[in-house]
Curated annotation (Swiss-Prot):
This is Queuine tRNA-ribosyltransferase. GO terms for biological process: queuosine biosynthetic process; tRNA wobble guanine modification; tRNA-guanine transglycosylation. Its cofactor is Zn(2+). One of its GO terms (cellular component) is cytosol. Keywords: Glycosyltransferase, Metal-binding, Queuosine biosynthesis, Transferase, tRNA processing, Zinc. GO terms for molecular function: metal ion binding; tRNA-guanosine(34) queuine transglycosylase activity. Belongs to the queuine tRNA-ribosyltransferase family. Its EC number is 2.4.2.29.
Amino acid sequence: MTAIRYEFIKKCKQTGARLGRVHTPHGSFDTPTFMPVGTLATVKTMSPEELKAMDSGIILSNTYHLWLRPGHEIVREAGGLHKFMNWDRAILTDSGGFQVFSLSDFRRIEEEGVYFRNHLNGDKLFLSPEKAMEIQNALGSDIMMAFDECPPFPATFEYMKKSVERTSRWAERCLNAHQRPEDQGLFGIVQGGEFEELRRQSAKDLVSMDFPGYAVGGLSVGEPKDIMNRVLEFTTPLLPENKPRYLMGVGSPDSLIDGAIRGIDMFDCVLPTRIARNGTCMTSQGRLVVKNAKFARDFGPLDPNCDCYTCKNYSRAYIRHLMKCDETFGIRLTSYHNLHFLLNLMEQVRQAIREDRLGDFREEFFEQYGFNKPNAKNF
């Protein structure tokens, strides 16, 4: 029996977006969903109890960072990631591939894996499909990701073709090295950049390997949003209807809605907590930078339409004061609000799918948020 099972519930008649549920060894979560990112086994400044209060059913942790600190063997000795961080709901771990390609100044890609330098101290390291599986098996996440090559945008067709072929070979090695398929589901990652032919080849290779789920990788790496949407339009239909589909590294409100419309079930991004640390908040009226001087005497909530802990209890003026004084509590309040905003947005997306009106919801939300305006400020 597979560790991960996707239950299809319904399709939106207006857009084709799908409502579903993913069942894991640590509970089920409704889709489409957003996964808060807990890189180092913590969602920055948030407690597990606060994440549960927001109704987060799954979070993401990072294989590369946990391998370096504290080390996957320590996490294994603690009883796995769930016990180590006191989180009894689902966890997804990425493979470390993206970090190897984005954080390391020096790297050498060979067929056996990638040689690179530790971004913390410069030590030489080596990560392979087998090592990525060993680390993730020790971490004990519910969903683990295959080790893939993450080419930058833009890349030539020739380079991307070689990269896709290598990613497929690595995916097969990941399947062979995976030691715990009965309680950890391994997802394959479709690559291919903006090239339809290569996406088609990558999807065909991976679907033939019968992974329990599939991710679309290599997007949200600097390409314009219209390219991302176009790639999703020709990639998502290549993936099995009875498996979850995950768009990696995407977390802006407009992209979550547009991704759901194109058949995506799962999203993750550091965006909500990263921008929160600079005082940037997502609200139903659009982007709000609470550090701005105009909020010094504004005693209203960050978002009058939000019922989160932050908005029910604290004013813009108070949060601005905390942020200007570099008080950690200010970052906690903005982080809580942004995470709640995205998780609540996904609940609204699911409700719109239930009611067959996601296209209308998108139009209303984009208008209210200001995404339709020329020169609209995005994240």
